[in-house]
UniProtKB/Swiss-Prot annotation:
Pfam families: Rap-GAP_dimer (PF21022), Rap_GAP (PF02145). Its main location: cytoplasm. Gene3D superfamilies: 6.10.140.210, Rap/Ran-GAP (3.40.50.11210). One of its GO terms (biological process) is regulation of small GTPase mediated signal transduction. Residues 631-651 have a biased composition (Low complexity). Keywords: Cytoplasm, GTPase activation. GTPase activator for the nuclear Ras-related regulatory protein RAP-1A (KREV-1), converting it to the putatively inactive GDP-bound state. The lineage of its organism: Eukaryota, Metazoa, Chordata, Craniata, Vertebrata. Residues 510-668, 698-730 are annotated as: Disordered. GO terms for cellular component: cytoplasm; plasma membrane. Residues 617-630 have a biased composition (Basic and acidic residues). The keyword Nucleus does not apply. This is Rap1 GTPase-activating protein 2. It comes from Gallus gallus (Chicken).
Amino acid sequence: MFQRKRSVSFGGYGWIDKTMLASLKMKKQELLSSADVTLPERPLSPPLTAPPTMKSAEFFEMLEKMQAPKLEDQKAGSQKHKEDYIPYPSIDEILEKGSPYPLVILPQFGGYWIEDPENLGTPTSSDSSVCEEEEENFSPSPYGYKLECKGEARAYRKHFLGKDHLNFYCTASSLGNLILSIKCEEVDGTEYLRIILRSKVKTLHERIPLAGFSKLPSIPQIAKAFCDDASGLKFNPVLYPKASQMIVAYDEHEVNNTFKFGVIYQKFRQTQEEELFGNNEESAAFRNFLNLLGDTITLQDFKGFRGGLDVSHGQTGVESVYTVFRDREIMFHVSTKLPFTEGDTQQLQRKRHIGNDIVAIIFQEENTPFVPDMIASNFLHAYIVVQVENPDADTTSYKVSVTAREDVPSFGPPLPSPPVFQKSPEFREFLLTKLINAENACCKSDKFAKLEDRTRAALLDNLHDELHGHTQTMLGLGPEEDKLENGGHGGFLESFKRAIRVRSHSMETMVGSQRKQHGGGIPGSLSGGIAHNSGEVTKTTFSPPVSAATAKNQSRSPIKRRSGLFPRLHTGLESQVDSRARCDSISGPQKTPDVGHSSQEMKSETSSNPSSPEICPNKDRPFVKLKENGRSNISRSSSSTSSFSSTAGESETLEEYDSVGSQPSTASPFKQDVFIYSASPGSDSPSVGAAATPVIMSRSPTDIKNRNSPRSNLKFRFDKLSHGSSSTSH
């Protein structure tokens, strides 16, 4: 007898064998004991019922093995990183050693350089990206200290403006938009070619001699000589009288004639940012130093360069220090003159202005070291530390040290050895020149250079577009005649516009050819055709006999046609009789227009559905006689719905046709069909005479006679053609 094996239920509802229970206990004990065994002795793949302690232990050991190489690399990297900066002691270690202290010490993790004749870490002059050029428009220094500025920024004003020269622009090159200025000049009997090439990366200014050239080089050759990537470019001349003013404005956008510098007062053994900004009292030595820098002015209603200070409501203090140095305005943000806020340890009102400066002066009244990273700021890149010596004596001197971030190039004038200055106008000249050159050099650091590159590229593109637009206007060309050069393209929108223009031109060409072939119109069998006017109108000629039901129809009053999207359907015997009577009413001869008969003619309301029209019940096969190029006996309905229209005469039909043609034409997107019914001469019934068979004629959806209809018009014509037997009956 088959016996079902008992199953183990973990829910507690099934029977459990004693033998199975014992085996489970043994396995559990083995697994628990295996947790104390070393990793190599453990099973490679623990069972699913392994205890959590075993699984978690193996999991964390596996993670440690996987992360071991990364941790070793990180440790090695951190050791190398620390080894690079081990020689730089902290400020606390310097203070423990006792005086004399250096003016500046490098941060523990580096990132700054110190300009000092004895310091080997000072960058050489070759690392500087600025050039020294004394400008003619500024007053010279009596002590020979030169202001460092970019010579390319003022070269156009100095050498090109107001003199004969040519300007060219290049569109959409591999280097972006380019603008080139060229000028011939002669110095000491030697001809030179002075060139300025502007790109989104930088501006190049060179002067090359023409002694070895038999003829002047072309503009693409000059651009190729400046940059190897500038090959195969096409330059266009700038034809605009005011182009020089626009170009000089672009070149001098980097020139700055207003500066603002911070001045921070550091007392003895102050090593924290909060301590520096918390000083409110000014010593006599500090006031004398401020008087050396400039004049103390009242901010209220101040008319000069305010440097971001409030000159209307006094929210940034009452006084400040201001000076004009070599035609440049300088405003100093003095920490002790900015508003002090009680309870604010960070003194954000003071740090808000000084922290946004690029260069700051640290004035030390006593011998105390300064660390550049002592002040947390993203903008401060250079510090000039000034320490006063013998402040109360007549021979007061100042010891100077300069520090800046590593990505800031060196700037002049260089410090003398030893870097000590007597209190004199020369020291003021040196200090102000050093401050201005320091800010110009800081603009070449990585952070500020990226901002400057984006600004330069945007301004260059704007200048190029303006010069191109003014040149096209001077030539009398519009935007449609603009052509992109050097493989440039206008993006998806311009490509789409060009495709649409090409398609429109091809459609117009097709329409013109169709008009020539078909006498000015496209056949109605072509669906989706172009709107056109056709002089040939297809009409049905008929000569119906006079029926006995005409008198009955004339006695009825005319029925007004009902317009609508779904016409009313006539059902029942009465509608059939009326329809038969209307069919008989048109059987009389209508060769000449009859006004009286037209006034009594009934224009029946439509009595059919477009899918199942109601027609006269005739069984014989009809025939249709078409007459071309004629307007007689035409019946048209101007209603937008499917309707029956009886023909009263030629004058009425022509008037109705003209009214339809004079209506505003709106193209219908649907193909329109016209159903024409004609009667055959063979008839079994004397009253009706012939059966009606539909003839479908397709018309263009843009036909001028149907363009006022929002949908397809079904026009039914009931024609009877007389024959010999019917004419003898009259």
